[in-house]
Amino acid sequence: MRWTLAAAASIVLGLGCGPADLGTAALRAFGNEPFWNVTVSDTAGIVYQRLGGEEVIFPYQAPRRSADDGTTLLFGPLRTGSGEHEIEMRVSEKGCQDTMADAVHPMRAVVILDGEELMGCARRLDDDPGAELP
């Protein structure tokens, strides 16, 4: 993943969604090397999955806004029902370029699963999956 000025500009031009819209929206965060994704839904919970791995399901908890900038949504820390896994996630309204998919996404995400930090992109599930790069 690489963050770019072009991706950030797409936010300013209105291609992204504002953080005010994210509190109730389903969203997906994802990254490469290792390939992983987190899907957030108030009905299905917060579901983490690594490519080829099993889903790890956390209870849904509405995000809160960071005190420092107000544009970053914070999820967690949350634990699975068994207490075996813990997740935290920060989603910010900063452009993100997925170089493997050659796509620009409106948000970036940092996920911490059981102490391992994963960085990637994010988008609302009802948004365009990403604008093509020129």
Go through each PLM region and give its residues.
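Classic N-terminal secretory signal peptides
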Residues: 8-12
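Bacterial N-terminal signal peptides that target proteins for export
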Residues: 1-7
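C-terminal motif of bacterial Sec signal peptides marking the signal peptidase cleavage site
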Residues: 14-16
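Cysteine-centric segments in proteins
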Residues: 18-134
